[in-house]
Amino acid sequence: METHRKTLLHLLKERAYKHGQFTLSSGKESEHYINCKPVTLSCEGNALCSHLMIEHVEDNSVAVGGLTLGADPLVCGIAQKAYYSGKHIDALIVRKNPKGYGTKEVIEGNKP
């Protein structure tokens, strides 16, 4: 498990962390910026994240979810890892705003 954690930290350092001048969503300036998407959207990074995060999902859980776009690869990876571990845990994706057409859902997926 420690090897997985170290490998993930290395990937985050190499692919997610940036040093420079950045304007944050708050409007503040920062010399540091972390964008985990290059890691969570890679096959290796997603597998490592899912492997490490599934340990924190309670045994009686039926779904994992999070806000789109950042959580999308994580919840899908965790759901897949759960399936291959013999557990039934679905993925849910939460929109920032309701979809403007069709069912106008805020939460996508098989809701419990």
Where are each of the predicted segments found?
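Conserved hydrophobic/aromatic pocket- or pore-lining residues that grip, position, or stack substrates
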Residues: G27, V64, A91
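Short helix-loop-beta connector
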Residues: E58-V62, K111-P112
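Short, glycine/charge-rich flexible loops or terminal/linker lids adjacent to PRPP-binding catalytic cores
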Residues: L74-P112
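Short glycine-rich phosphate-binding loop at a beta-alpha junction
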Residues: N60-G70
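Glycine-centered small-residue hotspots that permit tight backbone geometry or close packing
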Residues: G45, G65-G66, G100-G102
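Fold-independent oxyanion-binding glycine-rich loops
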Residues: C36-K37, L67-T68, V94-N97
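Active-site-facing substrate-recognition patch
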Residues: M1-D59
